[in-house]
A protein has these predicted regions:
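Conserved phosphate-binding/catalytic region of the ribokinase-like
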Residues: 9, 38-144
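Conserved beta-alpha-beta core of the PfkB/ribokinase-like small-molecule kinase fold
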Residues: 1-43, 51, 61
Length: 144
């Protein structure tokens, strides 16, 4: 939830010690860490034992690291943007789906970005979320 007092870290710190994958939005990560650089955010949060840290940055794409490798993932081009509601949640769902399917860090972030690209092209938070097979075909057809 949004917190205007600026004590985000204090509110979630105990949970961070039990978090393996942490994928906040850029704005959330700034509020939590006080940092503006995504790499500095990751360094600060690593002390909690997080295995994978990523930042969703909307039209700037995303950043993801396992603290050994790091990737900046550009967003997929879309024909139109109808509504961005749910894009971040779709990104997280896509990332976790890819991890469960055994994909690596980079592939998971690309998969997540593709799911978010589908989401922004339709009205509503979940109306545009396709099956994993459709997402994989979409990725194969892209020039990246």
């Amino acid at each position: 939830t949004w917190n205007r007092q600026g004590d985000w870290l204090e509110r979630i710190e105990k949970a961070l010690y039990h978090t393996d994958i942490f994928l906040p939005s850029y704005q959330e990560a700034v509020q939590i860490t006080g940092e503006r650089d995504v790499q500095a955010m990751g360094k600060m949060l690593r002390r909690y034992g997080i295995s994978i840290f990523g930042v969703k940055m909307g039209e700037q794409g995303s950043y993801v690291t396992d603290f050994q490798k790091e990737y900046f993932i550009p967003p997929f081009a879309t024909e139109k943007v109808v509504n961005t509601v749910g894009a971040g949640d779709s990104y997280v769902a896509g990332f976790l789906t890819a991890q469960i399917k055994g994909m690596g860090l980079y592939e998971s972030a690309v998969f997540a970005s593709a799911v978010a690209a589908f989401t922004v092209q339709t009205m509503g938070a979940v109306g545009g979320v396709p099956s994993a097979d459709v997402v994989e075909e979409f990725i194969r057809k892209q020039k990246r």
